[in-house]
Amino acid sequence: GRAAVSTWNGDVWLVSGIDEDLDRLEWRRFATGLFDPLGLRIVDDVVYVHGRDGLTRLIDINGDGEADCYENFNNQVYITPAFHEFAFDLQTDDEGNFYFTKGAPVNPGGRGFMKIVPHHGTILKVSKDGSTIETIATGMRAPNGLGVSPTGIITSGDNEGTYMPRCRLNWIEEPGYYAGVKDTAHRAPVPDQPALARCWMPMEVDNSSGGQVWVTGKGWPDLQGRLLHNSYGTCSTYLVLPERV
């Protein structure tokens, strides 16, 4: 098999030779010079990358294994010099719309925030054709990853810090979700209470949340349709056990 991997340093690599043994992997740089690309999605065999300056479509015109065209797919996202406004993840729904998250501009040292702009601490949606962008959820600190279910439920983690006592798992079924960070609420008045988290995670379980994955393939039949949560901080994967009461 093959995979595409983006790095914070600005590269996209194609990895071939993926099998059970993983003893003959070949890496080839497909693209370079991107702006902190922490999200990547392959749609119809075309690589889309999410960087701090928006979404880029990478096209290999002559078939030599390297991107020749770096197409500006959507650049409507706000950007600032803040080091912490990370551009996290890139997912799609069944209709082809794109979803990603934008970190809040945490001050060096971790307490408080630098200048806030409208897309800080949010989950954003870009239309299938790249023409529009809209905010789905606000009030986040560092939503390092998300997931989109086959039925359209959006999930995300968030990392502990200012206004975020522990890492939480957000469960978003409709636009307007507010996770609790007042500086990134982007609405007036600011809600008195945040939306309920699906769960809060102790530090020893997760001290820096990653994204989520809905199991849809046949490789793990016992987990079919279930949600997995990934922890960046503890390098772990957890099975989420939701219960509606």
List each language-model region with its residue ranges.
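Beta-propeller domains with acidic blade repeats across secreted/periplasmic ectodomains
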Residues: 1-245
